[in-house]
Amino acid sequence: MLSKQIPLGIYEKALPAGECWLERLQLAKTLGFDFVEMSVDETDERLSRLDWSREQRLALVNAIVETGVRVPSMCLSAHRRFPLGSEDDAVRAQGLEIMRKAIQFAQDVGIRVIQLAGYDVYYQEANNETRRRFRDGLKESVEMASRAQVTLAMEIMDYPLMNSISKALGYAHYLNNPWFQLYPDIGNLSAWDNDVQMELQAGIGHIVAVHVKDTKSGVFKNVPFGEGVVDFERCFETLKQSGYCGPYLIEMWSETAEDPAAEVAKARDWVKARMAKAGMVEAA
């Protein structure tokens, strides 16, 4: 029987680095998480996962079955390095090939949602042509995802092109495809001049998962929970009242910390306390 509890997950980069997924999922289970989100970033090490052998993919599936901890989503940030909006045709082609491989990987191992980074370009100057290429790249990507029955979900970013749910909804309407949805980050959403609660309400019906982190104006990573500007309790209340019942993912980058598990446990308790105040989970 499926649990009625709120699914709470942890980002791979919060846990100790390494390629043993059985150990990673066992630790996540010990820490009380329902799932882990995989990272495929712009490093060669994590990009190489998209070329895993059949045996390596099967090892991940077996680890999921053995531990009962799911890997339902992938954070695909590799497009920073190989952006879909690049004016260099070779770079853009690599970006589309990464997308194809990521969708195939997701299909093979049971990942349901690939979170996309909302950058037309990252290391170059954006213009109308990069945005056009980005839109066309998304269209091609969503066609691939549709055939594979894998959802592509746009993150609300630390970048003006995609820094609000309203802007991401524009792409959802343009693509008009059920396999393209939204994956807001309440930290990123709060760091800009957005009406956060109105934005969350506007996205209901399109939100497939929520990233949970704290931020400050202009600071989008490594802000300790409680030291930033995010009104977590209000965000959780708004999402609950609007009918959102999906997963929440604590996003952290503590893999190189002295004791990553302790950092994660502290963050988990802090977030769950705010969820309890919002009436989402029972108080500990």
Swiss-Prot record:
It catalyses: L-ribulose 5-phosphate = L-xylulose 5-phosphate. InterPro entries: L-Ru-5P_3-Epase (IPR004560), L-Ru-5P_3-Epase_Enterobacteria (IPR023492), Sugar_Epim/Isomerase (IPR050417), Xyl_isomerase-like_sf (IPR036237), Xyl_isomerase-like_TIM-brl (IPR013022). Induction: Induced by L-ascorbate. Repressed by UlaR. It comes from the Bacteria. Keywords: Isomerase. It is an enzyme of class 5 (isomerase). Pathway: Cofactor degradation; L-ascorbate degradation; D-xylulose 5-phosphate from L-ascorbate: step 3/4. Signal peptide: none annotated. GO terms for molecular function: intramolecular oxidoreductase activity, interconverting aldoses and ketoses; L-ribulose-5-phosphate 3-epimerase activity. The keyword Isomerase applies. PANTHER family: ISOMERASE, L-RIBULOSE-5-PHOSPHATE 3-EPIMERASE ULAE. HAMAP family: UlaE. Catalyzes the isomerization of L-xylulose-5-phosphate to L-ribulose-5-phosphate. Is involved in the anaerobic L-ascorbate utilization. Belongs to the L-ribulose-5-phosphate 3-epimerase family. This is L-ribulose-5-phosphate 3-epimerase UlaE. It comes from Escherichia coli (strain ATCC 8739 / DSM 1576 / NBRC 3972 / NCIMB 8545 / WDCM 00012 / Crooks).
